[in-house]
Amino acid sequence: MPPLRLTSVLHTALPDLSENGRALLSVLGCFNGHPPCSHELAQWLGFHDRYQLARALRREGLPPLEVIGGWARTLYWMSEAEGSGKSLRELAEREKVDPAIAYRLVRRVTGRRWSEVRREGLALTMLRFRDRCAKAAPRPTANLGTPPFLLAAGDPIPRPPAATTRPIRSTWRGAETRARTTLARPGHRVVQGISERVAVDGAPFDVAFAASGEALVTRPHAAAVDVLQLNPFGVSHTIRVGPTPTRVIPTARNGKNGHVAYVTTQFVEAVRIIDTERRQMVGSIPVPGHPLSAAMSPDGHTLFVTTNQDRLVAISTAQRTVVGSTAIPLTSPQLTIHPSGRWLLVPCWRAGVIVEVDASTLAITRRFDVGGVVQDVVVAADGQSLYAANEAGWLDVIHLPSGRRTAKLEFGTGALGLATSADQAHLFVGLLEAGRVLILQRQGLIERAVIPTGGRPRLIAPHPAGDGVLVANEAGWVDLLR
């Protein structure tokens, strides 16, 4: 997943911005220079409202959002025109924009006609953009507990509305189920339906259980990680980490730093360190590119992270620095480590392959060609079987000792999230577009239940003791399945 061309252009034009200024440019790059409404953009970057964002832009030395957005749009069209030879009219019509509006936008932000801008070329236009933002300068990182971009605004840390736990009607039981004071232990009982649901805004993506028994949920569109308590089920705290937190990796339950978790925050190009006891961010580890997925070595000494520069990097958790890296084709937000700790299994998204990497040398040892668009992967506790969800509509099973695919189960719809139950008896598969979670008996891949969650179920976290399963849903909630 290489960097978007517009993102690279913007970062090249303004190389000296703070990490949060670069995060703003990354968001503009994601939307081809046409960001969502200013309020939504403010939420992505961790601000309370658009006014706070505007004040931060002024302190960062950047022009108003309307101006910088217009320049980003113009640079996008310039980049596309040079790459494809298309006219501005063709580019505008492709995006369902009135060509007259596009021509006026270019004239307004650059002071020149499109024909003049095209003759000057992209490089000179980038220089003019840099000159327009000449006051931009790097800003020092103040308190790590609060995003520097937020501190620059001089405003208090915003508190999101309290999430609510509400009763829902279970499709499988046909009766209303309310929050209970204790959670039942299902053991080997198959999960039957949704027990409870808590509203979580910001497009929840990943969910994982911390050593304390609480759960951590990443909110990419809210620049935060929420702490979920199970009894009663709800959000207890919010930890601000910076734009686009994607994966969260708590340390081992029996480790000396069991209260620490690592969060890949894409647009600040760093892995954040949070303390789940103190409920705050306590550190940051810069990485080359936007960090996507992560996995911790069994001994807790090394954190492995993939980035959008198509690289796998190894981070020393003691030194808090990158100690090694290797090239990986088309990385994605998914990654897992073999129970032995000897190998990493890295899905390569649209490349349709999974690569096995030696954890000590970062050398690629094997490739498994499965086709499609590989998403989440898990390895059975005995280390014998690799399971891979595929967005093209199936699940692969690979026998790791031999490297052969031993089974393939078709779903007819894209699969994304994947997890094994605490007792290793079942697999949980999130069907993203269908809005369902499929429960399979691991032996024989026999379907045991289908739970309609609605929305867009993302990643899945079974409780280590078997006390239910959490499913992050991009539509704005987290489900507790029992």
Language-model features: locations:
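Alpha-helical bundle regulatory/interaction domains
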Residues: 1-171
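Predominantly soluble domains enriched in secretory-pathway, periplasmic, or organellar proteins
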Residues: 163-482
